[in-house]
Amino acid sequence: MQLTELSIKNQNVFVQHYIDGKEEMSSFFDYSIHHKDMWRERLEDLSSRFFAREELAAYLTSYHNKFGSSAMQSAIEKLKDPSSAAVVGGQQAGLLTGPLYTIHKIISIIVLAKQQEKELQVPVIPIFWVAGEDHDLDEINFVHTSEENGPVKKKLPQSYWKKSSAASTSLDQEKCAAWIDDVFAAFEETDHTNTLLDNVKRCLRESVTFTDFFELLIADLFQEEGLVLLNSGDPGIKKLETAMFQKILRENDELARAVSDQQAFMRQAGYKPIIESGKEQANLFYEYEDERFLIEKDNGRFVIKELDLGWTRDELHTHMEEHPERFSNNVVTRPLMQEFLIPTLAFIAGPGEINYWGELKQAFAVMGFKMPPVMPRLNITILERHIEKKLAERNISLQDAIERGTENQRETYFERQIPEEFTAVMDQAKSQIEAIHKTVRQEALKVDQSLEPLLLKNAAFIQDQLQFLERTVMKRIEEKEGYVLKDYERIQNSIKPLLAPQERIWNIMYYLNRYGPKFFTTFKNLPFSFQNQHQVVKL
């Protein structure tokens, strides 16, 4: 296995300017990731803040008992050290761990935590924030598999409440087991298949919810690294979040204004905000009968219109004290809650997160916080040996394949195989036959004007026959050149499936099935670096 790097620009202008260290980024973030003293500055800032370390460690210790991992428990123990900090990143609880970028994000968290622990000489804990309170299950209930004509979305055929969270939605064991079999049936059977499949199904049997299943698989892959999981949808964490829920309530109007002002500033600077937020939103959700509902503001009251529920500010404050488990964060308040709970040395962010965190600088300030350093996660492409070979055979650069895919090269190659004379003769035939037929039509219409529809239909039929002949010849060329054309498709399906980055479509199970556990051990321990280069892992 070999690690190389490529320089690939991000298509999001704001993200690329952040990566490039443009001066105007200081208006959106509190720390510059390009500043050499940034880590010590952040550590010093954290030292002046209070964190409920003992309480958080006690909760996490209890929560992690189910994983039976001494490395995880040792990492949690480090949180009690007042000098310790954490590298944090998060993602939704996707089935079979979700797209590859979830794995890449976790590797980013672990790599940066190890690097900074060595550099700063303080304990640095890798923490993965599992978005268990997220209720958009349609974003996590599928994986893509590679079929004859490219990637196919395989969706778990299970119904659930529309607004129920991942942490409270039970998996249908029978349907999920059958779905897993269906996913693995799309893989080529190898020496690793049965062991991997048995392990995945064991994790399923030990799970109740989407979040359980996700966490067990992640723990199985990363527990040796001491990765700590924080499930935001677990009722147990809510007691520690109560004071922050109440602070969000107290500062609610100011918080909404801060987000709105920052977004306006972002637009003025020529960038595009992505958070959909309004001043009538309270930026908190309320759980009612296993479904999540957005709390809104209406004439000084906090309401849930769908349920005809409402509270005064004081009533809601008391309700938070009595039932914190009923409340959860939205896209605005989740980063703030993370900052309240965890001494965060750095936040590992995907491109979309970099954009929306840039919309929250003033929101952090309203809460009395500085936004933690936002580190772009590692962008990784896995290059299989047979694909690398085909790139060389077809004279395609890896950079081109990653940035643009191979559809255009395939089309260009195919067009070159069509004899120029054939194309010219076909165009000439269509034109000449139409000219002759037009003369015939004109003469026929002199006999009977009512023949016009029939004559036009006849002309179209003749042209259709010519096009049929043309398509038949094209099909023969495609069959003749099938092996080469298929190479272009194989490259695209591996590196730029559906014209998206590999890490957004494919799932780690394909690689674990094909290359086995040793592949993953080597993969996660590669010497990745945070130089904002695209990482290429050659197998």
UniProtKB/Swiss-Prot annotation:
Segments forming a coiled coil: 455-475
Highest taxon listed in the record's lineage: Bacteria
Keywords for the protein's UniProt record, in alphabetical order: Coiled coil, Ligase
EC number: 6.-.-.-
Annotated positions binding ADP: 146, 384-386, 490-493, 506, 510
Pfam family, one: Rossmann-like_BshC
Disruption phenotype: Mutant accumulates GlcN-Mal and does not produce BSH.
Subunit-level organization: Homodimer in solution.
Main function: Involved in bacillithiol (BSH) biosynthesis. May catalyze the last step of the pathway, the addition of cysteine to glucosamine malate (GlcN-Mal) to generate BSH.
Protein name as it appears in the record: Putative cysteine ligase BshC
Organism: Bacillus subtilis (strain 168)
Lineage of the species this protein comes from: Bacteria, Bacillati, Bacillota, Bacilli, Bacillales
Protein's gene: bshC
